[in-house]
């Protein structure tokens, strides 16, 4: 009986009534599939709570930055510190949460709705907000923004946040190819390789490279490793 009810709750729109009923179900009393449904239902409730959290963050921080430096990554010292204290976050993390909440609540209503309905996760909503911010700063056409948002939400259903990031970036690149090329050139200037000694005769090499160059390096290392393995 509980398994059937859990499955019904999974399909219902998230909200306080559904959450209360889930709390009153002991997941250990469910069979294997029922436990999975229970977990998924709780995850959907998490999306609903996160949607409320975006509204609450903006209520504390305000809908606009203290200093108008754009739609993203502005610094709001008093509000940021209040949110950092309330949520036990580092100040830089609190500022990021403020930025994301403003973008979601003011520019991405469909994303907020999808989050509240448990259709996407908080991580996916954050990705959509962050990747949309550059276009918002440049004054994206509302129709383009709606297309970007709808595509990202639909893609999120069966993909991870990292995959959603790549998808949204590809859409952004097509919408503003000139700016994308500028950003690619700027990113290439940050390439670097570091060598760090480690204990017990070991060392660590870290590299930030253009993808094509990184692929070449990886293939060379892999080839050398395979050769040494075959010799042994």
Task: Name the predicted role of every residue range.
Residues 1-232:
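Conserved C-terminal region and hinge/linker of Rieske [2Fe-2S] proteins, especially
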């Amino acid at each position: 009986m509980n398994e059937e009810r859990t499955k019904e709750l999974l399909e219902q729109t998230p909200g306080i009534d559904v959450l209360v009923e889930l709390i009153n179900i002991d997941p250990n009393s469910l069979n294997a599939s029922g436990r999975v449904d229970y977990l998924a239902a709780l995850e959907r409730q998490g999306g609903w709570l996160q949607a409320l959290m975006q509204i609450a963050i903006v209520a504390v921080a305000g809908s606009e930055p203290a200093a108008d430096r754009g739609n993203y990554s502005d610094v709001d010292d008093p509000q940021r510190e209040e949110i950092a204290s309330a949520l036990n976050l580092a100040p830089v993390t609190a500022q990021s949460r403020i930025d994301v909440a403003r973008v979601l609540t003011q520019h991405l209503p469909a994303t907020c709705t999808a989050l509240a309905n448990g259709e996407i996760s908080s991580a996916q909503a954050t990705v959509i907000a962050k990747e949309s911010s550059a276009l918002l700063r440049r004054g994206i056409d509302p129709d383009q923004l709606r297309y970007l948002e709808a595509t990202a939400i639909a893609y999120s259903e069966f993909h991870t946040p990292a995959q959603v990031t790549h998808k949204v970036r590809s859409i952004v690149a097509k919408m503003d190819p000139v700016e994308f090329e500028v950003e690619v050139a700027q990113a290439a200037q940050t390439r670097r390789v570091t060598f760090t000694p480690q204990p017990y005769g070991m060392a660590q090499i870290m590299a930030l490279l253009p993808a094509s160059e990184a692929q070449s390096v990886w293939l060379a290392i892999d080839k050398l490793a395979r050769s040494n393995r075959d010799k042994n």
